[in-house]
């Protein structure tokens, strides 16, 4: 419950709000007679929807979503609800992580929190048909493992799961067994290279440390970065200060689809790109000042580099942006009348150039296409 109010003009009428919508009664005084008070939902056909993760494959479903409270959905048709409903086997309340094997597109893995009473269910599940049907993993790393984020090797051969406030765990047998990844701190987000199944990456943007693995995630090595933008990096005595919203897409590392070791660091206060084949050498993109969300989409016809989408501040202006030339130039794709409140996630459609998905905090997933 977030709030409760009694109508100042009608003592029988009261309302309270929850994440599931508003409720109201018109017989509040029944409680004084020790009789039941009848409450009814005020929403009709709508519900607060909070996307927690967006994953757009190159084939099959257009989008696979991780949702707060309702698990998530596989969106084959963007114009109508999928007949399969929310993801099952098991049903999650929250799906905090969902991703797939980039070179084996039918394999998708999700992690989250169980919904309701499912005593034998696990908090990780996978699909081998692009998100239509799901199989629970046989085990989880520890009995407390839930939520967090999942990374899947490009060929699906290994998965790395970092549950909430936990070490990173590796499985090579679809969750039948797990081992601790060596060389990683707790509670760090890991991603997979989109081409080389042996490569995984993680970044601590505040400490300026890049972690990389070349053995399929078993061992990580740390490299010190030199990120040149340092606004709002640390507070007194070196304590980390708040950098945007931890649920958003900032202070994360991203791997470019179709390109090995082509990495982006979307720091809260700057965008960095590294394409050096021998070592990690990140250069700053000067126009980007603040980042809240970052993602890729299908390349513009005639281009061989994916479109890049970003929510943040570029050249002093907040907005949703797309770049068709590897972040050298940007076009704003929204206007001041379409900002949708708190927005923490963005990704492009990998099957249709220009289509973009916006993850709002309570207003669902917004999709848009170029006006012309």
Residue ranges and their predicted role:
Residues 1-9, 52-59, 96-106, 148-155, ...:
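Structural signature of eukaryotic scaffold interfaces centered on beta-propeller domains
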Residues 1, 43-44, 141, 225-244, ...:
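Surface-exposed loop and turn segments in beta-propeller and other repeat-based domains
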Residues 2-13, 17-22, 53, 249-275, ...:
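Loop/turn-rich, solvent-exposed surfaces of beta-rich toroidal or solenoidal domains
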Residues 25-27, 72-76, 125-134, 153, ...:
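Conserved Ser/Thr-centered positions that define the repeating blades of beta-propeller domains
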Residues 38-54, 89-96, 229-233, 286-295, ...:
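Conserved blade-ending motifs and adjacent loop-strand segments that build the rim/top face
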Residues 21-23, 71, 114-118, 166-167, ...:
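Short glycine/acidic-enriched loop and turn motifs that connect beta-strands
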Residues 338-372:
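Blade-level signature of beta-propeller repeat domains, shared across WD40, Kelch, NHL, RCC1
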Residues 34-43, 83-87, 135-139, 179-183, ...:
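Beta-propeller fold detector
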């Amino acid at each position: 419950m977030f709030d409760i109010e009694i109508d100042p003009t009608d003592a029988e009428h009261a309302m309270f709000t929850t994440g599931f919508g508003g409720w109201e009664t018109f017989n509040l005084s029944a409680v004084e007679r020790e009789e039941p008070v009848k409450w009814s939902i005020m929403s009709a056909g709508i519900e607060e929807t909070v996307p927690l993760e967006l994953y757009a494959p190159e084939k099959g479903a257009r989008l696979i979503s991780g949702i707060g409270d309702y698990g998530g959905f596989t969106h084959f048709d963007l114009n109508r609800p999928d007949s399969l409903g929310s993801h099952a086997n098991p049903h999650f309340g929250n799906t905090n992580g969902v991703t797939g094997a980039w070179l084996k597109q039918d394999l998708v893995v999700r992690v989250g929190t169980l919904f309701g009473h499912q005593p034998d269910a696990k908090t990780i599940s996978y699909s081998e048909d692009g998100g239509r049907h799901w199989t629970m993993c046989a085990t989880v790393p520890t009995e407390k493992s839930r939520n967090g984020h999942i990374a899947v090797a490009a060929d699906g051969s290994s998965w790395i799961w970092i549950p909430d406030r936990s070490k990173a765990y590796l499985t090579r047998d679809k969750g039948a067994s797990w081992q601790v990844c060596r060389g990683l701190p707790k509670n760090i987000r890991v991603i997979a290279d989109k081409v080389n199944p042996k490569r995984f990456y993680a970044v601590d943007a505040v400490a300026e440390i890049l972690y990389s693995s070349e053995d399929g995630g078993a061992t990580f090595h740390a490299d010190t970065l030199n990120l040149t933008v340092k606004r709002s990096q640390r507070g007194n005595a070196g304590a980390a200060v708040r950098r945007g919203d931890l649920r958003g897409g900032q202070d994360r590392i991203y791997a470019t689809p179709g390109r090995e070791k082509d990495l982006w660091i979307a720091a809260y206060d700057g965008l960095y790109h590294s394409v050096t084949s021998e070592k990690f050498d990140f250069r700053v993109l000067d126009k980007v000042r603040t980042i809240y969300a970052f993602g890729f989409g299908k390349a513009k016809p005639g281009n061989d580099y994916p479109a890049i989408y970003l929510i943040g501040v570029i050249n002093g202006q907040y907005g949703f942006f797309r770049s068709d030339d590897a972040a050298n130039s940007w076009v704003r794709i929204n206007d001041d009348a379409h900002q949708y409140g708190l927005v923490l996630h963005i990704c492009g459609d990998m099957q249709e150039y220009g289509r973009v998905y916006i993850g709002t905090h309570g207003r669902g997933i917004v999709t848009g296409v170029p006006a012309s």
